[in-house]
Regions:
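Charged low-complexity "KEKE/polyampholyte" interaction tracts
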Residues: 1-36, 41, 46-55, 197-345
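Catalytic core of the SET domain in histone-lysine N-methyltransferases
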Residues: 1-23, 84-194
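Phosphate/adenylate-binding glycine loop and adjacent helical scaffold
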Residues: 49-88, 93-97, 101, 117
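Noncatalytic linker/hinge segments flanking ATPase motor cores
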Residues: 75-88, 194-198, 228-233
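Short, hydrophobic/amphipathic alpha-helical patches that form generic packing surfaces
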Residues: 77-85, 134-143, 286-294, 331-337
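Generic structural signal of hydrophobic/aromatic residues within well-ordered alpha-helices
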Residues: 7-11, 62, 66, 79-82, ...
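Short, low-complexity, polar/charged sequence segments that are solvent-exposed and flexible
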Residues: 61-64, 175, 207-210
């Protein structure tokens, strides 16, 4: 469309790179595709066009960037035009509206279970059907980190997510799509590291098959070793995954623990590695992992049952995310049980 061409031209004039790209509907909804399937594509949004997350406000139907946003006038005019013609306006915020409509209508017991098991942040319990919440959620779904600051990234944010694509790149001058071979298919990148299906749903409102699934909060005491294992149930990995309290107290605290994985034996390896500083034997660790995996399947299955009863015939992205995770954890549970049998035979 002419609107799209004008936006791309202005983007380039302001220092943006938009090589061989077009926008249209695909399997994942609206996305970015190559114009010429035999050539590579690239989007690079320079830092002068990055919009500070806290500088957007709603004025009537449109988004406005605050005067003290630090953006030059031409850049600000482009960003406002981009949001109002494409990203927020013109049904660009439709998916955010659908997510909020579904989430705010959920029965309180379901929301409370989601929060108790750390599938959502407690701030999501305050979501309302209001313009303020719509904008807050819209920004959260699109925010990138650049030099320690939360920013929105016009043009680059139109690229859809795949867990099996490389991540977007942060350079000194801005953010860009990862290099990829020309194969004619939709341009995709990974939004963030080791996402689980549930953390994708929480952060972006959609579900997708993921490589790993993380455990809910638990505290289990192994009496014969006078050791308590506590997991805080964070739904994404941590750089320092283990916080060992002094071993005399016999408490081992973990922020996040993989319980299901495409590499089906990885959860057991992770737990064995965490407990390698203790005296706990392999058989006890395998039994503990089986207990944790069953607990995680059970909790998700109960939640899914409640959800499906509430949703009747429509299947939400949340239901899909729970189903993905249950399957992934079940596969890993089978692998753990096989390892236990092998070691016992």
């Amino acid at each position: 469309s002419n609107e799209w061409k004008n936006l791309v031209n202005t983007f380039k004039k302001l220092g943006g790179i938009a090589e061989n790209i077009d926008i249209h509907e695909g399997e994942l909804g609206r996305g970015i595709f190559p114009q010429d399937k035999t050539h590579r594509s690239l989007i690079a949004t320079p830092k002068n066009i990055l919009v500070k997350s806290n500088s957007l406000q709603i004025k009537g139907e449109n988004l406005k960037i605050l005067g003290d946003s630090g953006m030059a006038q031409k850049e600000r005019e482009f960003a406002e035009q981009y949001y109002n013609e494409l990203s927020w306006g013109n049904e660009g915020n439709k998916d955010t509206k659908i997510f909020l409509g579904h989430f705010t209508s959920l029965p309180e017991p379901i929301k409370n279970k989601l929060e108790k098991n750390r599938f959502i942040d407690s701030k999501m319990l305050n979501y309302k059907r209001s313009d303020e919440t719509l904008l807050e959620r819209f920004i959260d779904e699109r925010a990138f980190k650049f030099k320690g600051e939360s920013v929105l990234v016009p043009m680059l944010e139109l690229v859809n997510h795949s867990n099996f694509a490389p991540p977007f790149r942060v350079t000194r001058t801005g953010l860009e799509t990862p290099p990829a071979e020309a194969n004619g298919s939709e341009i995709l990148h990974k939004y963030s590291g080791k996402n689980s299906a549930m953390s994708l749903w929480r952060s972006y409102g959609f579900s997708a098959k993921s490589i790993v699934s993380y455990g809910i909060p638990f505290e289990i005491t192994i009496n014969e070793y006078s050791t308590t294992v506590r997991c805080y149930g964070q739904q994404e990995p941590e750089s320092n995954e283990i916080k060992l309290k002094n071993s005399e107290s016999g408490l081992i605290s973990i922020n996040s623990l993989p319980v299901g994985c495409e590499i089906s034996t990885l959860p057991l390896s992770a737990l064995s590695s965490i407990l390698s500083t203790t005296e706990i034997d392999g058989e006890t660790i395998r039994n503990l992992m089986i207990f944790i995996q069953k607990l995680n399947i059970e909790t998700r299955s109960e939640l899914l049952k409640d959800l499906l009863e509430y949703e009747q015939n429509s299947i939400s992205e949340l239901s899909k995310a729970l189903k993905h995770e249950i399957q992934l954890i079940q596969t890993s549970l089978i692998a753990t049980e096989l390892l236990r049998q092998e070691n016992n035979s």
